[in-house]
Amino acid sequence: IGFHLAKRLAERGDEVFGLDSINDYYDVRLKYARLKEAGIAEEDIGYGKYVESSKYNNYQFVQLRLEDRGNLFNLLRAQQFDAVCNLAAQAGVRYSLENPYAYIDSNIVGFLNILEGCRQYHVDNLCFASSSSVYGLNTKVPFSTKDNVDHPVSLYAATKKADELMAHTYSHLYGIRATGLRFFTVYGPWGRPDMAYYKFVKAAFEDKPIEVYNNGEMQRDFTYIDDIVEGVVR
């Protein structure tokens, strides 16, 4: 999502600064390929190093972890951003069962650093990614923002609910305009290879069985990437 949003903003003339940890949750070659598409060469990237795009003169990139408070605050202090859009998080529901600390570091500590940075360096507008997973055991459909979200069924979902509460608190205390968007399974070009639709297509091409959970009784909504980006921009 961050890749498509950065391109959209750069193409409409905004000054854009992209940040990514480039972790190995999935194949980093895809991450570097996205960056190349945005004019950022892999060989130019180094941790904490600001890189200017060869394709967009209004786009820069830095490899950085959100939990690295010192470097993150240095960036926010130097750039004096009008708005921050936080789409960075440790993703995946099942992965959180085996790697819980990765979710606390990125999704809780990292997001707190974003909030505190916005407070200290006077960023007026914060948009951040929440998730449909916060609805947990809700059985009523369609889901609504008025629904109870107090019963998450994964650590990933719990961190996203926590992010919403933290953003609400900072908005109340410090006047930060914070908007959380509960994304529903985003699909489209350059998407993550661990998502179900990529796995289904890969299995079909390889003439292998498609792995289905919950005896095929599961339902899920999908949202195309262009619609997600349009919603964020608005």
Name each model feature, range by range.
Residues K140-P142, L165-R234:
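NAD(P)-dependent short-chain dehydrogenase/reductase
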Residues I1-V186, D226:
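N-terminal Rossmann-like NAD(P)+-binding domain of SDR-like oxidoreductases, especially those catalyzing
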